[in-house]
Each structure stands twice: as structure tokens, then as C-alpha cells.
A protein has these predicted regions:
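Catalytic-domain carbohydrate-binding cleft regions of carbohydrate-active enzymes
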Residues: 2-507
């Protein structure tokens, strides 16, 4: 156990991107959490805590974090490293990154950054069919958005984990990928470490020892959002070779370009599971991350201690709400937290929210809030990635759709900027999306969570509250040119009118 007295005006970030909306933590914070799954959205984890005063905590193993009575307690039976003297949040991050998760010079594919991504989930749910997917793709093109990465989400296969049998939903996957390629899309398909626990294929991999067994030595059947299933033992090299063989077949014979690797959270594993290579439940997520990292077209939601690596890290499925836990208000702080944990190539979930309601004709529970959808698009527009799912052309009024389209196009216009920042991240470890405190320390910006810095020279200040048409914007020292062409002297706070069709952003004048 390590106890650290929190300094005056000291703020802390870390451990779990899904709790970013609660950050930063300070001397008045009363919270305790482990590295187990976060019911508010697991997202990405790292055994790392960073301070605005240039201090940090690192451990090679999971730990429990407690902030109480002005003291930070790190509870673990393993070694804990406590470092001081890095001066700032940025200094602490860079020191920890260089020592413990240096970036490897690799990035996901450029297309993730230079074009919007599209996902079939909110349109089709688990009813993924050839006709439905092609109709969705054609609508994207017909509505002037242009091609990009297209992800065929969960439910496209007949049985989880087995891709080539009883293909009634998509009887000819090669035909489907060929048609999508003709439209200009790159095609990813949903995969996971979960396998259906019935049938000939299941019996084969069971008998080969590819599945996790519980403490009693029986095949572990775990509950998840689609029922009960077995789980692959990815600590076994033979299991990994089999899975990669399946992926290779999907790529070479069926035209798939890459994979959305879902699930893999700690909740699928137990510390006392019988594995080929014993490890803690939390660490199995790392092995899952290793599985997909070599594919340039990849996407993960669950990650552990994988900072510095070339994976797309998506935020947990968001609700269509203004909330701070799983709504629009979590986007900026959680994305900032991702970057501080070493996950630079981050995607802020689907515009409007990716938590599906299968009872709704439009995939979203309740009525569509057009103001929310617009503000969500604006909040994502100048982040490094944007992912669309539900077709805004069919759920919004003409006026709202035109505003949304404007900011989708703005995202495309900044594609080369995003790509340059991704390449920079791969070499320096610097996040693409940064907090004001990270980039401009010493100005009292620690608790600002409704604006962010793109790279080092663009401040973005979206609206994330319903009915807000005026907002304050903090501008640091220097000269700043607004989206409306107005130049401001920095080291000030300005008040801006923000009608529904405006996103405030400011470029530093060189």
C-alpha cells in the first residue's frame, strides 16, 4: 500500500478512461475504485495516476485507488512506483510514458483520421443482412458524406466466434465486401473472444483446449449482453494461431479489411480461471489487445496497459442523453483521460450515442433530440475521429440535417491535420486531444472539462448543455483567431454567442 498526501491545488487523473467525467480528483474527492469493470463504461485502463503538480504513480499490476480526506491511497500487494519532480501534468505524463509505455511508431490506418467512420449497429442492430448493409452504405454516398471505414457490427454471423457456417444472414460475404469496396469503403467486421457453446465447431475447439476453464476445471460459461457463452483462452499460442487463421481467411478469401474487436473486459475472466498461462483476470484484456493490434484496421473498446500501441480506442457505448456518465457530457473528459493513459488514437463512440434500443424504430430510446444530435456532431467534429451509425438524413429535420452535414464535412476538412497529429503521437506519445491543463499549465485550467486542445494550437469549445446558446471560452496567452474570423488577445475569458449552427474553435495565430 502507498499513501500520498494530496498537495494544495493538486489535481489527479488516471486509471480508467470511463471515469474521466469524474476527473480530475483532488483533496476534496471521496471515491474508491478497483481496476475491475466500471458499470458506467469500462473503456481503457492503465495502472497509472498523474498529477497536475508533476507527480505520478505506476505499478506493473492492477491496484485499488482511493481518494479520501486529502490522501491518495494506492492499495496493492505488488510494487508501486511514486515519482515526483516532473513539474506539470504534461511532464508527469511524458516521463511515465517514456519509462513504461513508449509509443512504437505505428498508427492505425490513415483512413480512420481522414474520413468519418460508419457503423451499421444503430441502423440494423443484430439484424445484419446483405440488403440492409448495402442500403445503408448507398444512403451514405447518396447523401453526400463520402466513403470511409464501414464496420459491420455484431450479429452478422450465425454463431458467435464461428464465421463460415450457416451464413443465412449474409450468404455471400465476398459479394458484400466487393460491393462495398466498389463504393469506396474499407470493410471491418465485428469479432470477439466469445464463442457459441454448441455445434461441431464448438466441440472441436473445446477438445483442442482453446477455451477457458473455471476453477473446477469445467468449461467456463460466462454471461454477457447477448446471453451465455464460452470464452477463448488467448494465453494459449495455439488458440491465437487458430483465431488468426480465421481472421486471415476473412481477409484473403472474403475481402474483409479489418476487425472491430469487442468485449474482452475483465468481467469475462476470473483470477482463478485455469488458463494455459496463469494471469490475473484484468491482464487477460492485454492479451486480447495483442490479438488485434497487428491489423491496421482495428477497433477496441476494452483495453488494459496497452498505451503506446497502434489500436483505435473507442469510448463505451453512450446513451442519447445530455448526461455526464454515459451522455454527451462524458465525451470531452473521457477522451482527455484516454490520451493521458496512452491511448492516443481515440474515437468518441457513435454520434448521438451507440447504446441501441431494439424496441425503437430509429434505434434510440424515446424521441430524437435534434439539438442533442447537432451538439454531439459538433463536439466530435474536431476530435481525431468521428463515427456515425444511425443515419442522420432519415431521423432529422431538413434544417438539422444540413447543420450536421456541415460539421461532418468540417471533420473531413481537418483529416490531414488529424493524421499529422496521429503520426506525431506515434513518435512522441503526445495525445491528439489534450486538456487545457496539459497544454497550458499554471493558468488555473485544471477543472475545465468542456473545452479541449487539438494538438497544441487549436482550442475547441463545444456546447454540451441543453438550451445553451452562450458560453465562456478560456483563451491562454497569445493571439487566437476564432471560427468567425475574429482575433482575440489571450490570457482572458471571453463570452461567445453559440447558436445551434455554431461550434466555437480558435486557431493560434503564429
Amino acid at each position: 500500500m502507498k499513501q500520498i498526501k494530496i498537495l494544495e491545488n493538486e489535481y489527479w487523473w488516471g486509471v480508467n478512461a470511463g471515469r474521466g467525467y469524474k476527473m480530475p480528483f483532488d483533496a476534496n474527492t471521496d471515491i474508491s475504485f478497483s481496476m475491475g469493470d466500471n458499470p458506467e463504461g469500462g473503456d481503457q485502463y492503465a495502472p497509472l495516476l498523474l498529477s497536475s503538480k508533476g507527480r505520478y504513480v505506476w505499478s506493473e499490476k492492477p491496484f485499488t485507488t482511493t481518494f479520501k480526506d486529502g490522501v491518495l491511497t494506492v492499495d496493492t500487494e505488488y510494487d508501486v512506483e511514486f515519482v515526483e519532480g516532473c513539474e506539470t501534468l504534461k511532464g508527469a505524463y511524458l516521463d511515465a510514458m517514456k519509462k513504461h509505455f513508449p509509443f512504437n511508431g505505428k498508427t492505425p490506418d490513415k483512413l480512420f483520421f481522414t474520413a468519418p467512420q460508419y457503423n451499421t449497429w444503430m441502423e440494423l442492430g443484430t439484424g445484419q443482412t446483405t440488403e440492409g448493409i448495402l442500403t445503408y452504405a448507398k444512403s451514405i454516398i447518396d447523401n453526400g458524406l463520402g466513403a470511409g471505414v464501414l464496420m459491420i457490427d455484431g450479429g452478422w454471423q450465425e454463431q458467435y466466434g464461428f464465421y463460415f457456417t450457416n451464413a443465412r444472414k449474409i450468404p455471400d460475404l465476398k459479394y458484400l465486401t466487393d460491393e462495398l469496396h466498389k463504393m469506396g469503403f474499407k470493410v471491418m467486421v465485428w469479432v470477439s473472444p466469445i464463442v457459441g457453446s454448441a455445434g461441431h465447431e464448438y466441440k472441436q475447439i473445446r477438445d483442442r483446449g482453446y477455451l477457458i476453464r473455471n476453477a473446477e476445471g469445467k468449461i467456463a460459461i460466462r454471461q454477457w449482453w447477448s446471453g451465455y457463452s464460452a470464452v477463448l483462452d488467448l494465453t494459449n499460442p495455439e488458440t491465437v494461431a487458430w483465431v488468426r487463421g480465421e481472421y486471415k481467411k476473412l481477409i484473403e478469401e472474403f475481402g474483409v479489411d479489418g476487425f472491430k474487436l469487442d468485449a474482452g473486459d475483465q468481467g469475462f475472466y476470473r483470477d482463478d480461471d485455469k488458463l494455459y498461462q496463469p494471469m490475473l483476470a484484468r491482464e487477460h484484456t492485454y492479451v486480447f489487445n495483442e490479438l488485434g493490434a497487428p491489423y491496421p484496421f482495428n477497433e477496441y473498446r476494452a483495453a488494459y496497459k496497452f498505451g503506446g500501441r497502434e489500436i483505435v480506442a473507442r469510448l463505451h457505448d453512450k446513451h442519447h442523453s445530455w448526461g455526464e456518465k454515459l451522455g454527451i457530457n462524458s465525451l470531452i473528459p473521457n477522451t482527455i483521460a484516454q490520451g493521458l493513459l496512452g491511448y492516443a488514437y481515440c474515437c468518441p463512440d457513435m454520434v448521438g450515442g451507440g447504446q441501441i434500443d431494439t424496441k425503437s424504430e430509429v434505434g434510440i430510446a424515446g424521441a430524437i433530440d435534434e439539438e442533442l444530435f447537432i451538439r454531439w456532431t459538433q463536439a466530435n467534429a474536431l476530435m481525431g475521429m468521428m463515427q456515425l451509425s444511425i443515419g442522420p438524413w432519415r431521423i432529422l429535420s431538413k434544417e438539422s440535417w444540413e447543420i450536421v452535414k456541415k460539421y461532418i464535412h468540417l471533420h473531413r476538412e481537418y483529416g490531414e491535420k488529424f493524421w499529422a497529429l496521429a503520426q506525431n503521437a506515434s513518435k512522441t506519445g503526445e495525445p491528439i486531444v489534450r486538456s487545457m491543463e496539459y497544454q497550458f499549465p499554471g493558468n488555473g485550467y485544471e477543472t475545465i472539462v468542456d473545452q479541449f486542445v487539438l494538438g497544441d494550437d487549436i482550442i475547441v469549445a463545444p456546447v454540451v448543455k441543453k438550451g445553451q446558446f452562450e458560453r465562456e471560452v478560456h483563451l491562454p496567452e497569445g493571439r487566437w483567431l476564432s471560427d468567425e474570423g475574429v482575433e482575440y488577445d489571450g490570457n482572458t475569458v471571453i463570452t461567445e454567442k453559440v447558436p445551434l449552427d455554431r461550434l466555437c474553435y480558435y486557431k493560434k495565430v503564429k
